[in-house]
Amino acid sequence: MQRGEPIRMADAHHAAPPAFLNVDPRVPPGVRELLVEADGCLKAGFLTGGTVCAQKAVQTLLTHEAAEGASFEARLHALSQKYPSVPQSLFALCIRLGDSPSREHPALDGDRLKVLTVALKIMLYEIYVLGPDRVERLKYLQQLLESCESGAHSKSPTVVAFPNA
């Protein structure tokens, strides 16, 4: 497989897993445990159990983040508003695949379950790893900027590297 070439589901099993596929300890324990269980069910071929665990992980995340709304979709929309830097496509996938199973479709097939768990892992990585890391980087930059400006009597206006701190 060449760089820039799309990953096929069969290839995804042989490549070294990206960092975001390992659920970080900063992710709320209830969500993390459900995702581990969903992965275990998927590997064992228990698609109904995996589907229930993955969908419960989404619900647990919504509860943990106090995402309110009249429907599952509205709650995910509220979460997307809380974290605007998280790609909207991840929320769309959770809306499409993460709602509770119905009698007609009790379980996702293996590929769709994998897509849901990976989308959720990426979302969690964005929220609980990249977001806090971004805040730390910007705070550090702000401190550097403030030390530069306090040492020099610049005539230029003060620049704020991190306006929402």
Question: Where are the regions that the model predicts?
Answer:
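Hydrophobic/aromatic-lined pockets within catalytic cores
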Residues: 43, 62, 66, 125-128, ...
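Short runs of predominantly hydrophobic/aromatic residues within well-ordered alpha helices
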Residues: 31, 50, 54, 58, ...
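Alpha-helix boundary/capping and short turn/kink residues
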Residues: 47, 66-67, 106, 110
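Structural motif corresponding to the C-terminal cap of alpha-helices
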Residues: 42, 61, 102-105
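Charged alpha-helical initiation segments
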Residues: 1-47, 155-165
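Hydrophobic alpha-helical packing segments in soluble, helical-rich domains
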Residues: 49-73, 79
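Long, charged low-complexity segments
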Residues: 1-3, 72-164
